[in-house]
Amino acid sequence: MPEESSKSSSSGLVAKNITRSFKDNLVVRKVSLRVDRGKVVGLIGPNGAGKSTCFGMLSGIIKAESGDVLIDGISVTNLPIHIRARRGLSLLPQETSVFTGLSVLDNLKVASELHQTRPTKRGKDGTIDNLLIQFGLKEIEERRGKFLSGGEKRRLELARLLVSSPRYVLLDEPFAGVDPISINEIKIHISSLAGDNIGVLITDHNAADILDICDNVYVMKDGAIIFEGDPAAVAADETVKSVYLGN
């Protein structure tokens, strides 16, 4: 029998009524959302809304108490994070995951070894070298991680995500610790992920930073989804504007 527990005809990364509590505190309440390949989807809300817990349940770091998580119609709710990664789901955590003692190039090589992939078979047209070029890292490939700027670290982390050829990626606060100029560069790279038919779910404490790259947006408050729509609808909603966009 395969590892998957159930199948459906649906595609996409899908959460169905996922719920989680900590110490009798209901943190996430029956959240449902969908990320299709080739789309960028935003998840916004104030601190404590439950966004990171949702990311944890989607990635497998946190177990959902109820509900279901599916990748292309296959339930992965009871599968650990490394099995979900094999199913095509990768997570970029909020805290940097760069190996500070290794060079940029070696960070990518280690990722390749961890995913049991061959470096000559990764990247847009086949190699780690292409990832270095794609993410503007070629000229600093020998620089160790501890000497990278916040923006360079994020670009390296995005490049490492592609080593495993994911179908879906979760980006948790990808602009944290990044200067405004680098934020714009990273936005371009995130949009390029969707252009490569990867589904992206992104959250950030500053909703205005991600609305311009999203196709669809979910708004969370007190552990529940309270609004869903395209960026224009989100930006036009008075409650969303006052609470989340600071207008």
Feature names for model-found ranges:
Residues R144-L148, E152:
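Conserved ABC ATPase signature
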Residues V169-E173:
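Catalytic Walker B motif of ABC-type/P-loop ATPase nucleotide-binding domains
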Residues K121-I140, K187-S191, T239:
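Conserved ABC ATPase "signature" region
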Residues S75-E95, K121, D125, V234-E238:
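ABC ATPase NBD coupling module
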Residues S59:
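Helix-to-loop junction immediately C-terminal to a conserved catalytic motif
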